[in-house]
Amino acid sequence: RRDRWELALLNAALERDMPVLAICRGMQLLNVAFGGRLIQDLPGHRTESPNGRWESTRHQLYISPGSKLAAILGAGGFVSVNSLHHQGVGEPQKAAALMASAYSVEDGLIEALESPSHGWVVGVQWHNEIEKEVPKNFGNLFQSLIERAETYAQRKEAIPQQSELAPL
């Protein structure tokens, strides 16, 4: 039920060309919404602490210099980020309509996706909201999303009527 509801919300946003920042499971959902698949179980991308909670690990990734993500962050290249997921997207699973813009150096998994056919649709596998675990310039992702959302909100069709998004 959660997947259906989240896919419906994501598809409604995509149809309206709303800006979308999809984080972790959101990036995976973005790939599925565009017709891609997931690797179902990835060992080593998170650890379990003694209290039973999942904790993030760290790994290196490479951000493609010509990508939208690199433009938002101000640079491409190698960076270290957190990892806290057990599913993921590799090249064979990636939706054809999406562009991979960052890869894990260790295992080649896709760490960021973007939609070239939308104004601002970016998905990242890491948890950008955990500021202490990402480079400082990664805050640009949120700032760029806010700016795009403000621009979008000024358009007449920006806010859908509640009846358009009926529960599943």
How would you label these PLM feature ranges?
Residues 5, 12-37:
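Catalytic nucleophile loop
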Residues 40:
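Class I SAM-dependent methyltransferase SAM-binding "motif I" and its flanking Rossmann-like core
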Residues 2-16, 43-168:
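Amide-donor transfer/coupling interface in amidating biosynthetic enzymes
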